[in-house]
Amino acid sequence: MEDYKQRIKNKLNVVPMEPGCYLMKDRNDQVIYVGKAKKLRNRLRSYFTGAHDAKTTRLVGEIRRFEFIVTSSETESLLLELNLIKQYQPRYNILLKDDKSYPFIKITKEKYPRLLVTRTVKQGTGKYFGPYPNAYSAQETKKLLDRIYPYRKCDKMPDKLCLYYHIGQCLGPCVYDVDLSKYAQMTKEITDFLNGEDKTILKSLEERMLTASESLDFERAKEYRDLIQHIQNLTNKQKIMSSDKTIRDVFGYSVDKGWMCIQVFFIRQGNMIKRDTTMIPLQQTEEEEFYTFIGQFYSLNQHILPKEVHVPRNLDKEMIQSVVDTKIVQPARGPKKDMVDLAAHNAKVSLNNKFELISRDESRTIKAIEELGTQMGIQTPIRIEAFDNSNIQGVDPVSAMVTFVDGKPDKKNYRKYKIKTVKGPDDYKSMREVVRRRYSRVLNEGLPLPDLIIVDGGKGHMNGVIDVLQNELGLDIPVAGLQKNDKHQTSELLYGASAEIVPLKKNSQAFYLLHRIQDEVHRFAITFHRQTRQKTGLKSILDDIDGIGNKRKTLLLRSFGSIKKMKEATLEDFKNIGIPENVAKNLHEQLHK
């Protein structure tokens, strides 16, 4: 054990006093942290001398060796650091990749564009507007535009006119040669509206309302009036921050007790439409952490570069400009400076509000995993992955995996599996298949390995998993089994070659954590199994109806989504989406038996 400490000590003596990046590695030779420094030797030595906060202490405790790369400048170090973080995705770095996603409205780049709500931005595939405060806000805006403009709705062009054409919400480009100039005009008006210019659309609706009223079509006139009110309500809900309608993001931050909070205000058309809060445990200086953060922030698909980015004046503008390809502004006075100060103040408030909760939560969860590691005689299990199977007499067998990091659920790393190779209700073989698939992929893609694997089951499940890991994949990862009592409650943890009971008190934090893990993986597996059964049941009902093949089945599922909606549909509804009358009658009769 002491050998690695001596190796680290010896290597520290040859690290140069130059700028560069460093990579910390654990006992499995996995990169667990990437950092940068103006002077590599000083920064690296600081990790192995003096006292640290809890997170840094845990990081240092896992380091078995390090590597470093010398660069010619601080800017080059920052760019290299961002690339290394993207490449290795170390667990001790603040990884923003999947943590947050925001809803945008997209106009697709197609001959006949569509209007979509999406959380993924793919450059070159269309125009994006947002982000929106939440999915509901984006969906409501899209629904409003769908009612006003007969834009194409179908993902793929159908062979026949769909329901949207018959209700006046599509021009039918799948069948008719729609005038492209008319479509372009609609696109312009939608774009103007999404950019905050609602006068054109309001004027158009007012003209339609007046025409309908003069034609004594009062029902249609009322519909236009309601749409006008809806638009006015939608635009009035947002807080006006500025009469300047430049699209900009405003950054402010606060630092205290080894933590950094960064707030981002998304300003669109003079309105603050959303804000983002990120907490970062400081591993570098606050300026260095900020440069890394903002570099990651805009290298991800869910963040579109605005026209301007406003940041505090104490930061190096050139460093930010090297990783953010848009106009960087550091306001010195006036409303723009006030906005940066407001973001910083909000960061400070958020930091203060979170401290007590973070402290309480950290102490509880860290104590739980430390206690678990001590009782099992293993290294503190920072990353735990747990598996559970679900099926009814072998029908639609599925499995699920949940991930806990630092004793807390890491939902973006949950996974679902449909059992592919096992016939009938064989829990052991199902568990072997899923573990084989999971960790084959982890090895192939260089993903982080867990410190502990937990299976819902006993010695048989454990032995099967250990056999796959050690004899097929060459992995040595601790495997434990969680068993339940006759009341289906978490009862005991099994570990070791003979699956002995780990002595945990029922009122301990470690036992409570295991209870949470078992409940969570069971919930996740059951929910997935229920969803799978519903889909299977839905398809089987349609399979039994004459005249309904794969194409019509897909059409029905896409148009109605559920058996309940199909039962509520009329014969005309089925005919309107292209179902022949005789098949529609048969379908209608079968659904109402």
From Swiss-Prot:
Record domain UVR: where: 199-234
SMART domains per record: GIYc (SM00465)
Domain GIY-YIG stretches: 17-94
CDD domains per UniProt: GIY-YIG_UvrC_Cho
Domain of life: Bacteria
Chief location: cytoplasm
Keyword set, alphabetical order: Cytoplasm, DNA damage, DNA excision, DNA repair, Excision nuclease, SOS response
Regions that span the bilayer: none
Cellular component, GO annotation: cytoplasm; excinuclease repair complex
Function: The UvrABC repair system catalyzes the recognition and processing of DNA lesions. UvrC both incises the 5' and 3' sides of the lesion. The N-terminal half is responsible for the 3' incision and the C-terminal half is responsible for the 5' incision.
Name used for this protein in its record: UvrABC system protein C
Organism of provenance: Staphylococcus aureus (strain NCTC 8325 / PS 47)
Gene name, Swiss-Prot/TrEMBL: uvrC
